[in-house]
Regions:
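C-terminal transmembrane helix end/exit motif
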Residues: 1, 167-196
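Alpha-helical transmembrane segments of polytopic membrane transporters and translocases
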Residues: 11-37, 69-70
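Interfacial segments at transmembrane-helix termini and the short loops linking adjacent helices
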Residues: 14-17, 65, 83-112
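Interfacial transmembrane-helix starts/ends
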Residues: 24, 44, 56-73, 77-85, ...
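Helix-loop junctions and terminal segments of transmembrane helices
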Residues: 34-54
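Helix-loop interface residues and adjacent transmembrane-helix termini in multi-pass membrane transporters
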Residues: 97, 126-127, 153-156
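Membrane-interface junctions at transmembrane-helix termini in multi-pass inner-membrane proteins
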Residues: 109-139
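Membrane-interface helix-loop junctions in multi-pass transport and translocation proteins
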Residues: 131, 141-174, 189
Length: 196
């Protein structure tokens, strides 16, 4: 009887390690497009700070609007490509992790919100409100931790629980930061200005 239990435990541990490995490989793929949008937001902070120092809020609004536009312009095609080609991409890059296509597809939602959060956080940093993203991330992190415990332990959800909790964390972060950014400046995001 003890041998059967030990064998079952070993099988569960092996499955957990496999799923954890797949998730880590998906996270690596997801972070490639985010590196590009992250660079935009690094440049956004001094650009916004300089406009704020001369009280040129119209320029601040234009720069934030353009940053949202550029992030969406970069991240949405990447997300669409990852959704459409999730399985072939994983088979090509990580053949042992090709069963994680559904994890990659769901993770694209997280990728979109992380990209938008870079812009919102860059705006808040430009206004000198560096504590707001930190507090929002702490709140999102607590929610993520609780959701991880509940969802990952559910055998029907399993490792997808980690992805779902990451989405929840990023959505919470976006809502809180966007609320406080709108308190600093009434955002007028108009993508038409950047297209034509």
């Amino acid at each position: 009887m003890l041998g059967i239990l030990e064998g079952g435990k070993a099988a569960l541990e092996a499955k957990a390690m496999e799923l954890s490995g797949i998730l880590s490989k998906v996270v690596t793929i997801i972070h490639l497009p985010l590196a590009i949008t992250g660079a935009f937001c690094t440049a956004l902070v001094p650009a916004i700070s300089s406009a704020i120092s001369v009280k040129d809020y119209e320029t601040v609004n234009k720069r934030l609007s353009f940053s949202f536009f550029a992030s969406i312009l970069i991240i949405m095609p990447c997300a669409a490509g990852l959704v459409a080609l999730a399985e072939p991409i994983l088979k090509l890059i990580y053949p042992a992790a090709s069963s994680g296509a559904n994890i990659l597809i769901l993770s694209t939602i997280t990728m979109i919100f992380v990209s938008l959060n870079y812009v919102v956080e860059g705006g808040l940093y430009g206004f000198g409100k560096v504590h707001i993203p930190a507090i929002a991330l702490a709140i999102g992190g607590i929610v993520k931790l609780i959701m991880n415990i509940v969802l990952i332990s559910n055998p029907d959800i399993n490792i997808l629980g980690a992805v779902i909790s990451s989405i929840a964390c990023q959505v919470i972060l976006f809502i809180i930061c966007m609320y406080y950014l709108n308190k600093q400046i009434k955002l007028n995001i108009n993508f038409k200005d950047h297209i034509f």
